[in-house]
Structure formats: C-alpha cells, structure tokens
Amino acid sequence: MIGEWNYGTGRRKSSVARVFIKKGTGKIIVNGKTVEEYFGRQTSIMICKQPLFLTNNAEAFDIKVNVHGGGESGQAGAVRHGVTRALIDYDAALKPELSNAGFVTRDAREVERKKVGLHGARRRKQFSKR
C-alpha cells in the first residue's frame, strides 16, 4: 500500500489527520465514509478540498483519511493540513503555491487552559464593591 500512496500528517487544535493520496478520480474517504457524509457542513467540506482546488488537482487524486480528536472544524483543518503535506510529498514543486496560500503552516492556536480560582481561562468571579 505504501508504495503507490503519498502520506501527510495534518494537525489542528486537538485533531490529528493521517492522509494518504494516490492518483485517481477524486474520491475522498474520511474514516470509512465519504467526505460529504462525514462532514455535514459545506464549509468543512470546502476547507478539506482547498489545497486540491488551488493546485487544480480536484479530480486527480483519491484520498483516504483517518482523523481523530477535536471537533468538526478542527478535524477539517487537520485534513486540509494533511492533504497539503501529502501533495508536497507527491510533488515538491507545489510547495511555493501552497505556502503562499498559508496551507503549509501549522495553525498553532490551542485552547488556553483553565486557571485555578477562575471560571475559565480568563473569566474572573464577579467583583462586588459592597
């Protein structure tokens, strides 16, 4: 399987996606379901396909994805990052174009931890003057 497939790992928030691509007809399988079945929202589906449309490869590759952790938005971002890395593994000449679009860079924003004595990461208890 590894011989004909190109691989990329994508991460976003607490989601991790393992992406395998090979030449094909444009089918995208995420955790055993089509991308439309797995991601209900159209925006999440578009996010997953952005690197393919940018490089004019929307119908050129079959993609198999295993993704876990996080929610729908984070998983879609992880899939996009993984697809980008797999495309670069397939053809390094695509890297400048994908990099200019900002798809190569890992979005490092994570949830800030809750602090002791506070309601959340920054929300404090209501102050009473009297």
Swiss-Prot record:
Belongs to the universal ribosomal protein uS9 family. The keyword Cytoplasm does not apply. Keywords: Ribonucleoprotein, Ribosomal protein. One of its GO terms (cellular component) is cytosolic small ribosomal subunit. It comes from the Bacteria. InterPro entries: Ribosomal_Su5_D2-typ_SF, Ribosomal_uS9, Ribosomal_uS9_bac/plastid, Ribosomal_uS9_CS, Ribsml_uS5_D2-typ_fold_subgr. GO terms for molecular function: RNA binding; structural constituent of ribosome. One of its GO terms (biological process) is translation. This is Small ribosomal subunit protein uS9. The keyword Ribosomal protein applies. Pfam families: Ribosomal_S9.
